[in-house]
């Protein structure tokens, strides 16, 4: 992981440890949005991983889908 990825994953981890316990479980998906964000950034890099995480967070609301939604695999052609 490069420095940008480490910083972003670290920020998500701080959220998971400091804020998430106080807010309670709100996510409609498995894995949770924060776990999805960490995995997306680790797999796809800081820019694309952040974009995937932001799209996922935008879908995590009442009236949208729910359930199992894994991070897409890395396309080896790119």
Curated annotation (Swiss-Prot):
Where's it mainly located? membrane
CC per GO annotation: plasma membrane
Compartments reported by the entry: Cell inner membrane
Membrane topology per the entry is: Peripheral membrane protein
Top-level division of the source organism's lineage = Bacteria
Keyword Ribosomal protein appears in the UniProt entry: no
The record's keywords, sorted A to Z, are: Cell inner membrane, Cell membrane, Membrane
**InterPro entries annotated for this entry?**
Membr_insert_effic_factor_YidD
Supply the Pfam families for this chain.
YidD (PF01809)
Q: Does the keyword DNA repair apply?
A: no
What's this chain's function?
Could be involved in insertion of integral membrane proteins into the membrane.
Family, similarity comment: Belongs to the UPF0161 family.
Fetch the PANTHER family from UniProt.
MEMBRANE PROTEIN INSERTION EFFICIENCY FACTOR-RELATED
The protein in question is named: Putative membrane protein insertion efficiency factor
Q: Which organism is it from?
A: Thiobacillus denitrificans (strain ATCC 25259 / T1)
């Amino acid at each position: 992981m490069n420095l940008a990825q480490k910083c972003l994953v670290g920020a998500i981890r701080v959220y998971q440890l400091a804020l998430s316990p106080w807010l309670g479980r709100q996510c409609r998906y498995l894995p949770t949005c924060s776990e999805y964000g960490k995995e997306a950034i680790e797999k796809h890099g800081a820019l694309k991983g952040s974009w995937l995480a932001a799209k996922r967070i935008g879908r995590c609301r009442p009236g949208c889908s729910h359930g199992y939604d894994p991070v897409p695999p890395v396309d080896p052609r790119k």
